[in-house]
């Protein structure tokens, strides 16, 4: 009887080992099969710093005139510092702990190239802090950093208690435009005078609490500026509709909220009020009004043949937006998931895209403007959660993570 019990235990142990092995083989293995190679470099420096664990989630990257790619980070998992770094695709160099100079800022949310090869950035903080007025968050700052001198300058707070979600610069006219978070106000900043202008609420965001975490949906994630100085963005139209008399319930609401999403608006230079362009972001029918999804523009880049390439949040579509004619041309999608969160041109002339849900595998896709083909290349590594891509001076695609200990993958396209 004792031997039978021992045999049964060994059999159960064998089944557990077999099950775990099958599960491991059943998991998706990360791989990008095309191109010359894929390697990665670590952003965080470990316990010794200066970029500690929890401070290396990458928020943006831009290629500067000195040939280096500069990136920004945000704090995660309760960490408090955000940083600027730069890389040549071989190693990462820390250049600035921004929180040590502007206290209370835990995220550099966006970067732009300013006049004179100066970096312009904006800041924000944790959603939990923005959700609690008692935390006393002073507000998101604009700042500048000069790579040639290593000097940074605080350009001030835009809105008390509000972070800054995204910015874009009109270099010809010396203007910066941005969107506050979570209030969703469009604003401008004049570099010469230092004055700001609040154009008011362009999106009434809805507060979402998922698994105990608070966030706000619908706030524009990207701004586009054309040569005429006109600013474009996507937003929702929200209105309250009265219930019919027979629909009213005792003690219940007399109205319901209706949303119309993915509307592309423009603010012409010198105007005070944005207007609807008449076109909307491509979406699956019926999803434009669903509050569970964000139907908007996740990413945008100037197209080399005119207009802007844009990636959508809700469906992961790639589309071309022509501001001069208010035309949208949908190119479709090449993967199952959604959220084309970042775009970059590679050295081979193709448009590369980063897609995927915020807390899931990140996929690399490419669009060939010569053939019109969209292909899914795979993902850097199983469970790699990436936030942004950027081409370096060699035309390689840098793919950056937004985790506690983040890596940058360096992908070299085929010629």
Annotated model-derived regions:
Residues 68-71, 119-120, 175-178, 231-233, ...:
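Conserved beta-propeller blade signature
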Residues 75-79, 125-130, 183-185, 238-241, ...:
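Short glycine/acidic-enriched loop and turn motifs that connect beta-strands
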Residues 384-415:
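Blade-level signature of beta-propeller repeat domains, shared across WD40, Kelch, NHL, RCC1
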Residues 47-81:
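Beta-strand-rich domains and repeat architectures in extracellular enzymes and scaffolds
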Residues 63-66, 113-116, 169-173, 225-228, ...:
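Residue-level detector of Asp-centered blade-edge/turn motifs that repeat once per structural unit
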Residues 38-50, 96-103, 154-160, 199-215, ...:
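Surface-exposed loop and turn segments in beta-propeller and other repeat-based domains
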């Amino acid at each position: 009887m004792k031997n039978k019990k021992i045999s049964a235990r060994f059999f159960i142990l064998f089944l557990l080992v077999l099950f775990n092995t099958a599960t491991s083989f059943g998991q998706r293995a990360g791989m990008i099969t095309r191109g010359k190679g894929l390697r990665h470099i670590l952003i965080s420096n470990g316990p010794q710093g200066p970029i500690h664990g929890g401070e290396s989630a990458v928020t943006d990257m831009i290629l500067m005139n000195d040939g280096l790619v500069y990136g920004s980070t945000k704090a995660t998992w309760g960490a408090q510092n955000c940083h600027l770094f730069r890389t040549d695709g071989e190693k990462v160099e820390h250049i600035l702990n921004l929180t040590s100079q502007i206290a209370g800022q835990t995220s550099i949310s966006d970067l732009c190239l300013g006049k004179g090869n100066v970096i312009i950035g904006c800041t924000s903080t944790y959603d939990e802090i923005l959700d609690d007025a008692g935390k006393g968050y002073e507000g998101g700052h604009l700042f500048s950093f000069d790579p040639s001198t290593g000097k940074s300058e605080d350009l001030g707070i835009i809105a008390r208690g509000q972070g800054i979600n995204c910015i874009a610069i009109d270099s010809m006219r010396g203007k910066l435009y941005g969107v506050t978070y979570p209030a969703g106000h469009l604003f401008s900043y004049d570099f010469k005078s230092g004055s700001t202008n609040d154009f008011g609420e362009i999106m009434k965001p809805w507060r979402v609490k998922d698994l105990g975490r608070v966030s706000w949906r619908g706030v524009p994630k990207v701004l586009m500026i054309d040569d005429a100085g006109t600013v474009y963005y996507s937003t929702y139209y929200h209105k309250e509709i009265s219930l019919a008399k027979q629909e009213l319930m005792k003690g219940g609401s007399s109205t319901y909220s209706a949303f119309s999403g993915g509307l592309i608006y423009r603010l012409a230079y010198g105007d005070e009020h944005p207007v609807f362009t008449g076109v909307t972001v491509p979406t699956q029918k019926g999803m434009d009004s669903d509050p569970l999804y964000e139907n908007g523009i996740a990413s945008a880049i100037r197209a080399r043949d005119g207009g802007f390439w844009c990636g959508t949040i809700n469906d992961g579509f790639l589309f071309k937006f022509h501001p001069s004619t208010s035309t949208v041309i949908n190119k479709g999608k090449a993967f199952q998931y959604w959220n084309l969160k970042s775009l970059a041109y590679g050295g081979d002339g193709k448009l590369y895209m980063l897609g995927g849900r915020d807390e899931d595998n990140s996929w690399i896709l490419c669009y060939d403007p010569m053939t019109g083909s969209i292909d899914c290349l795979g993902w850097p590594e199983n469970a790699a959660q990436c936030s942004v891509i950027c081409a370096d001076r060699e035309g390689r695609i840098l793919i950056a993570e937004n985790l506690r200990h983040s890596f940058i993958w360096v992908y070299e396209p085929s010629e």
